[in-house]
Amino acid sequence: MSFNVRGSFRDARKKNAWRNRADLNVATIGCYAPDVIGLQEAQRGNLGAYHKRLAHYAHIRGPRYGNSIPHDFNTILFDPERLEPLDSGGFWLSETPEKHSRSWQTKVARSATWALLGVLGTDITFLHLNTHLDHVSALARQEGSKLVVRKIAEISGRTDVGPPAIVTGDFNSRPDNRVHKTFTESGFVDSYLAAGNEEGANTFHAFKGALYRDAHPARGPRRIDWILLKDPEGRLRIDSHKIIRDADEDSGLYPSDHYPIMAEFGFQATGFRFQE
């Protein structure tokens, strides 16, 4: 699952404040029970709720991003009964990725979190990287995506197995944008398209749900959240992809201003399946 959860300190005095939608947000994750989750915009209140109410997940918080406190995190959650962390880390999307920094006219400092995960009881491993590209600077999105591709190659090169790589994130870019091409030209496959879906969907909806498109017809579809796979050896099979549009119809609340998305993968050789 990839889920921009909308930070818990945002919208504090509004209907969509975290305190009003936390139950629905947590319940949505619990209902679909993915094995791995890439969170974007996770702040202390969000993570505290997940620690308490989704306690079976282990957390890899990753480096903070943003310009000031409260910081955001691209945290990875995983089910330790199915997966074990073999290595993990993070970096900033900048010309100096080893430290909290900004480059390329980015509005705020941005980061990525990664984890090399092993499937318990098997010799299967895969790399998961989770990120959130800038919402203002097109240059930052382009250069950030290039850096992510390079870092994945670097991390994979340190392993003996050359694992499949899965990237989750809020890319603040439509699929017809240069950012998407940076990934596909580097061998990544968009799980939404690979699962047989057609373009025209939104993943960002500004807490308006299906009404968002009617309110902003000139903007067109905004499928800006993706789950991407690079697996040149064909070890993983993309079985499905869904955009989760759950909402509380009585209150009109949504879990976030983005829909969570989820893909299901199967390993060709073993039949093992997991939900990302």
Model-derived segments and spans:
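His/acidic metal-ligating clusters that form di-metal
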Residues: 111-129, 138-181
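Acidic/histidine-rich helix-loop elements
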Residues: 2-23, 93-107, 134, 211
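Structured beta-strand-rich core segments of catalytic domains in phosphoester-bond hydrolases
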Residues: 36-129, 133, 240
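Metal-dependent phosphoester-hydrolase catalytic domains
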Residues: 82, 139, 153-165, 173-276
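N-terminal, active-site-proximal structural segment of metallo-dependent hydrolase catalytic domains
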Residues: 1-53, 64-72, 146, 269-276
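Active-site neighborhood of phospho(di)ester-bond hydrolases with catalytic His/Asp-centered motifs
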Residues: 37-40, 62, 166-170, 190-194
